[in-house]
Design a protein with these regions (language model features):
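AAA+ P-loop NTPase catalytic core and its hallmark functional loops
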Residues: 1-243
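Alpha-helical lid/collar subdomain of P-loop NTPases
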Residues: 1-38, 48, 55, 222-227, ...
């Protein structure tokens, strides 16, 4: 159980990290990480491609104890970005998905019946929040804009730097560990969903939003960056033919994004969708079939002819969906 274990690391990070070398980013920023790796550190993905602005915001959060929120469309790698930075700093990282079933009890803890000397006794089991606050942990709240209001006000207690966590049931006040860090990812900027893409998101109290020191936006990547991601994850496409195919995939994704902005279609392809399509292509060896399975079948039936037209523009081939049966 997490709540029964302490992470034994120095109170402060003890190893200098060369940002330019480790993250391939032209920056003079100096950051510190931990020399030793523990079981809570995410696995390093050597093919990961870092976005400069997002990475610098995350690094500032780690180095200067800033509360960092990353906002952006789905599939852009917001949470993965934090994990991969943490992995290279050897910084323990825990992610919590703030779905509607997460409660105050889940975060703070509860009384539980346990066996002690063959007798049942009631004992308080602390939740993930007190455990994280007391350890050198980067705590990441995913889907932050889906959290319930009562849960959000629990989080508000620790948003301020050196903000102490009070457990009323235990008459206990917990001071944060000097290397505790807090991050969040969100699809909206706390004003609710205006796109229709993110059902279930809620408006966030502006007093709470004000407590986040840094808000950076990670939306869709430029084509060269996105191509690097796809080629890195699907090395079979590193040849000339494969790169040309990947470029056409990304071109099609851009058309769906532009179509969404213009309100021509209600679905769009994220970088994750493009990557999934490339991986499915390697399985089925059929660009049309893998496209249908990855994205087209998820589109509104009335919009499929438009998406099929995008496909024809990029690949010079027709899909059967190109012709609207109602026309």
């Amino acid at each position: 159980m997490l709540d029964s274990k302490k992470i034994y690391l120095p109170n402060k990070p003890n190893q200098k990290i060369n940002v330019k070398k480790i993250f391939a980013i032209d920056s003079d920023l100096t950051v510190l990480g931990f020399k030793d790796k523990t079981q809570w550190v995410p696995e390093t993905d050597p093919t990961y491609v870092f976005d400069k602005n997002t990475t610098l915001a995350i690094l500032a959060g780690f180095q200067h104890d800033r509360r960092v929120m990353i906002q952006g469309y789905h599939g852009t790698g917001k949470s993965t970005h934090i994990e991969q930075v943490a992995a290279r700093l050897n910084w323990p990282c825990v992610r919590i998905n703030l779905d509607s079933h997460i409660s105050r009890i889940d975060l703070l803890g509860k009384d539980a019946i346990v066996l002690r000397n063959e007798k049942q006794v009631t004992e308080f089991k602390e939740g993930i929040l007190p455990w994280s606050v007391q350890n050198p942990v980067a705590l990441v709240f995913d889907e932050y804009d889906v959290g319930r209001p009562d849960v959000m006000f629990v989080i508000q207690r620790i948003l301020e730097v050196d903000g102490k966590l009070t457990l009323l049931d235990q008459n206990q006040v917990i001071s944060p560990h000097s290397s505790f860090r807090l991050f969040a990812t969100t699809n909206t900027v706390g004003m609710g969903d205006v796109t229709g893409l993110y059902h279930g998101t809620q408006q966030i109290n502006q007093g709470q939003m004000d407590r986040w020191h840094i808000l950076t936006t990670l939306n869709y990547l430029d084509r060269a960056h996105e191509l690097s991601v796809v080629i890195g994850k699907v090395p079979e496409l590193k040849n000339a033919k494969g790169k040309a195919l990947a470029k056409s995939m990304i071109q099609l994704a851009d058309l769906t994004r532009q179509g969404f902005i213009n309100e021509d279609i209600s679905s769009l392809m994220s970088p994750r969708t493009v990557l999934t399509w490339a991986q499915n292509y390697m399985i089925f060896k059929d660009i049309k079939h893998s496209f249908r399975l990855t994205f087209l079948n998820k589109c509104d039936e009335a919009e499929r002819p438009i998406v099929a037209e995008y496909f024809q523009r990029c690949f010079g081939e027709d899909l059967t969906e190109s012709h609207n049966p109602d026309s």
